[in-house]
Amino acid sequence: MKVTIDGRAFEAAEKATILDVARANGIYIPSLCEHKRLAPFTACRVCLVEVQGRRGAVPACGTHVEDGMVVTAQSPALDKLRRTVLELILSEHPHACLICSERTACPEHKTTIRKVGEVTGCVLCPNNGRCELQDVVEYLKIDRVKFPALFRN
């Protein structure tokens, strides 16, 4: 079956998702909740794309391709929508290191370690440097969160 993503035509397997086809062909669509060993969860909504003929944006991780489908995966409108979604997610999680302008050359270990040993900064996190959340924040160029922080430690 043929699928077009951002003007490029691809062959796709039946039951493949938009995200599967994009990744197989080197097109980056940010996502946080998708995992190859799990069924599509569509919880984070960061992988939203537009499908010609459908109203609104749909999650690429949970939308199966159809023959002749035309998908827009990259656009300023989608990036704005993804930024808003990610800012809402970050408003409920510790995010200071993720959006700090000094995050790539932090002069100190800017972390908060509570009595229980909880690390809320990226510097001491065992996934620092290979975290999908860091990649998505960088890709969407998020440098502030306009929603109030609601997380509890």
Residues covered by each model-derived region:
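Eukaryote-biased recognition of intrinsically disordered, low-complexity regulatory segments
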Residues: 1-8
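N-terminal cofactor/phosphate-binding cores enriched in small/glycine residues
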Residues: 10-67
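Fe-S ferredoxin-like electron-transfer domains
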Residues: 45, 54-153
